[in-house]
Structures are given as C-alpha cells and as structure tokens.
Amino acid sequence: MDENTRLQVLADIEKYERLGEFDRHVDPVDMSMALPVDENYQYIPKGFLKIKRELERKIYVEPFRKKANKNILKTEFRGRENLEGLGGAIITCNHVNKFDCLAVGQAAKGHRVYFIGAPFNNMKGFMGEMMRAGGLLPLSDNMTAMKNLNRAISALLAKGNMVTCYPEQAMWWNYEKPRPFKDGAFSIAVMNKVPIVPMFITFRNSGEFDANGIEIKYMTVNIMKPIYPDVTLSRRENVNRMREENYRMCCEKYEEIYQKKLEYVTGE
C-alpha cells in the first residue's frame, strides 16, 4: 500500500466507522490478479502438490515469517501460555494489516495454522504460491467449493491443526478498535466441537513516520484464554455466547492496553 492509498484508506475507515459499516472493504481489490476457486480447488493438496507445498512452506514461508516478525513488523507476543495443551482450535483475530497472518502464525508457533481468506487472496504468481503454501483456505461463491472447504476445515481440526478466521470480515489498516463479529468462526467451532482462541492485535508507536506523516506502528499479538463450546446449549446459543464472549474479551483488552474507554464515532 503506497502513501497516497494509505491516506484514502484512513479516510474511508473514518467514514465507515461514522456510518457504522464496520465490514466494508476499504483496501483496493484487484480480482484480475486472483485465480478462480472452483470445485476443483485442492484445499488439502495430495501427491506432488502436497510435496511442493510442504517444501515451499519449510524453505520460504516459515523462515520469512520468523524474520518478518522480528526485523520488519517487530511483533511482540503476549499470552502464549494460553495455547499450551491445545489441539484443534479456531483462532480469531482482528484484521488490521495485510501481513497480520504472519503475526498470527508466529504467535501460534508449534502449531500448524491455516487461514480462511477472501477469494481475492488466491493470487497468481509467486505471492499466491507462498500464501497457499502458508495455509490459505480461500472462500468461494461456488457452492461445491464451499462444501469442500467445510470438509477440509473439519479434517484439519480433527488432526489437531488450528484454523484462523477473521470475524470482522474486512481488513482495516492499523485500526485499533475491535469491530462487531460475524458468526462464521463461531459456527465452525461449535460444529467441530473445538475451542475459540481469541487473539487481539494492538499497536505500539515506533517514533518513525512515512512520507505523509503517518506514524509507523508495530504490532503486539495478545493471545487470550480459549473459549469452549457449552455442551448444554443449542448450536445457536453457543454461537451467540462464544461470539459475545470473544468480543467482550477484545474490548477489555483494548481498554487495558490503550488505557481509554472504547467508543465508536458514529451517527455524525
């Protein structure tokens, strides 16, 4: 994202917060750069493709993820003890940077982490190859593909992997506040009888500024205690309870880190 685009994105974020439209995409999307996600898409690759992806992950993705968090993003991690002893789980996180998947993946190091993403993330070229090797599970408007995705998620969770879902839906660059959550992540957790692992990214000032005077921010990934489904509740009750609890935890973490009350500027 160049400096001029950043200014427009920040203006759009301010506009949509005032309108209460927290799930609007504000970053330019170029679908011409995306590969189709149809009924033939291999969410869990087999044969040669499996070997290729594993090699790409070990040779390129994991070393880059480690170096990027340490040297570029300067990410800090708090609460890793909350991941101890966990197997399959759904990670939720606020979506505030194109590369926050690198921070989430590093936060859960020691676990294999996959990422549910919008179809436009299934990119052509080297970047797309690295995203797929890094665990991208793209959504689709193809019903058969979506059924395949749901089956793949269940299989991955059953094997003890973690799957990341961004319940706010859209990426809002450097946005500090938690936004209202969609049901998807919590429905998946309830259906598969696995916990939610809430993560919430907060920002630290760097003291450095870009060409437009916008301060460069460093991320801290706050890993909170898992939220488990309640076997005594119905599916809908569980989804609502887990979603509301996750959102409450993020709101409390926001107020703890920034030392101010969470308030949205809306209706003006």
PLM regions and their residue ranges:
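Catalytic core of membrane glycerolipid acyltransferases/transacylases, capturing the structured
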Residues: 85-143
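Short, basic, glycine/proline-bearing loop/turn elements
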Residues: 64-65, 133-140, 168-171
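Short, glycine/polar-rich helix-capping loops at beta-to-alpha or helix-loop-helix junctions
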Residues: 52, 122-127, 207, 216
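Non-catalytic C-terminal accessory region of glycerolipid acyltransferases
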Residues: 1-35, 150-268
